[in-house]
Amino acid sequence: MILGANGERLSKRHGAVSVTQYRDDGYLPEALLNYLARLGWSHGDEEIFSREQLIEWFDLSSISRSPAKFNPEKLHWINQQYLKEADNTRLAELIIPFLEKDGCHVAGGTNLELVVALLKERVNTIEELADAAVYFYRPLEPTDELKIQYFNTETKPILVGLIEKFNHIEWTRESIHHEIKTTAKHHDVKLPKIAMPLRVMVTGEIHTHSIDAVLELLGREETLARMNSHLSSFPD
């Protein structure tokens, strides 16, 4: 028997859903199988195992006699481990429906496999992976609060100068990082003073992967277009 976190029999009141709902929510089938098998059975301290290992190791004598409690956080964690090891081509195919549902046009945009490789370490589900990838395929408008916090008269001329520098450098993560770091040193400001408004201009968010890696994948043309589009949002 599977119980909810409160010790009661698992039911719809606990958010119990069908197997297909877990698929639609972005869980990998092998992760769900791993989690369900581990609910009432164990093989030492092993938490992650393949289908083949499950077949090899499974023994009725190792089944717990006590009811198991369903733990969504544990399922998240197991799914995350599988996502980290999953093939990027497969993950790219899996997130396309989520991105299209969010109004993104993947064809002709940033290489989706490279985006997946960059982002998959920090997410728990395919749905979260797609959410994290949205800004690569359509610009996100920063909130007014973010504009007030990061778009100011002090940083505007610095970013205008950075746009000029970005026009002429080799478009690699290393070169982008070097230019941001050099610009910060030249203006005697800390790196976040430039990186944060730059991140907001380009992604519309403040929590992303390293900004140099994001810009490299986004590409020079799209990066500069987004930066230029937000210069008018800075106070004079």
Feature map (PLM): residue ranges:
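Alpha-helical recognition segments enriched in aromatics with Gly/Pro capping
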Residues: M1-L83, I96-P97, H178, M196-V202, ...
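Short coil/loop linkers at secondary-structure junctions
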Residues: L28, S42, S61, H105-A107, ...
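Short runs of predominantly hydrophobic/aromatic residues within well-ordered alpha helices
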Residues: P29, R51, A92, L112-V116, ...
